[in-house]
Amino acid sequence: MRNNILHSVKGQNAAGDLLYKIYSSQKIPHAFLFSGPDGVGKHFMAVKFLELLNSPSEGNTSSSVALKVRNLSEPFVKFVMALPRGKNETGDNSPTEKLSSETLEELKEELEKKVRNPYYKINLQGANNIKISSIREIKKFQSLTYEEAKYRAVIISDAHLMNDEAQNALLKSLEEPPEGMIFFLITPFKNELLPTILSRCWTVNFDPLKREDLSEILTDSFGVEKQVADKISVFSNGSLTHANTLLDQDFDFLIEKTINILRNALALKYQSALKDISSFTASSSAGELTLLIEMIITWLNDASKNKLGLQEYLFSSHSGTLEKFNLKFSRAAIDEVVFKLNDLAHSIDNNLNLNVIALNIIFELASIRYFGIKSA
């Protein structure tokens, strides 16, 4: 579409076109659900759409209101997110009243990063739920009258982190919003929202990013070298959040460890495989072990592609290893192993001991040798 500034959100032209049609109709719903994977531009699109709605003329988003929208400044934007619980906090306290000075400083820094880079994923320790007190504050925000902005917004990040009580409290705000008030509920897990919430929102779906778009955003918005961005984007599943998780690792080391663990487990060298995995469990970081499982699954999926004669692999520099694997383990039930590895990844979220999970990873991979070799 001509002059659609929403296309500045890379890789989301379909969502941008839908929102532009809504903008052109001037029939603006009071609530949107932006649904799609983490790290694909949902928050950025909400900000750009609100800028567009408040622009004095189409394509002109340089007004002072637009700047305040970009800065997530109240009373233009109410930004709601998960927060840690403070010491002795009760439902009568405000969302931040009982937080320590250190946590408040961390929150301030994280919000500043989000303002500077709308693709940034806020990471606040202990922030696991959206507090009902945060939802109740929306009523106060709605009661303000402010004529400088034609449209104001409530942006709820990771809306699925509201429990049922918080969602029911939100319903009251959704049912009778004042004129010019828009809600943006942003989540990768829309099915965790109550049907009564979903029925009041206009759903806009967001797609995983294409590799070239993801690489370009990594370069432009995160300052990643192009060569590194191109390599990372291949393994990122179309998500900047996943890409940044990979960037936090030594990526070449991660690939090397993945191959070594597979090689040792398949050779039944349990101690060597366990030693390699121990570097992912030593820090007691569930995220690192989850990442390793994802990399192993990616390699096994590449092996399945090779077996089917497909040529495009994520582990493209190891195509020879994939061929040797399929020659040796032609009867391997890769799908079953991948299914069990996914179960192990989910069990990490249930606080199962990481060392127990590490042993199970090795045993699942070793099972390929027992059942995958073609009999003579």
Task: Name each model feature, range by range.
Residues 1-71, 179-182, 188-295, 299-376:
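Charged, glycine-rich active-site and insertion segments that engage polyanionic ligands
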Residues 2-161, 165:
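Clamp-loader machinery-focused feature within the broader ASCE/P-loop NTPase space
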Residues 140, 172, 199:
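Conserved adenine-binding aromatic site and its adjacent loop/helix in ATP-hydrolyzing domains
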Residues 143, 168-179:
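Conserved catalytic/switch belt of AAA+ P-loop NTPases
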Residues 148-153, 178-184:
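Loop/turn-to-beta-strand initiation segments
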Residues 158-162, 174, 190:
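Conserved Walker B
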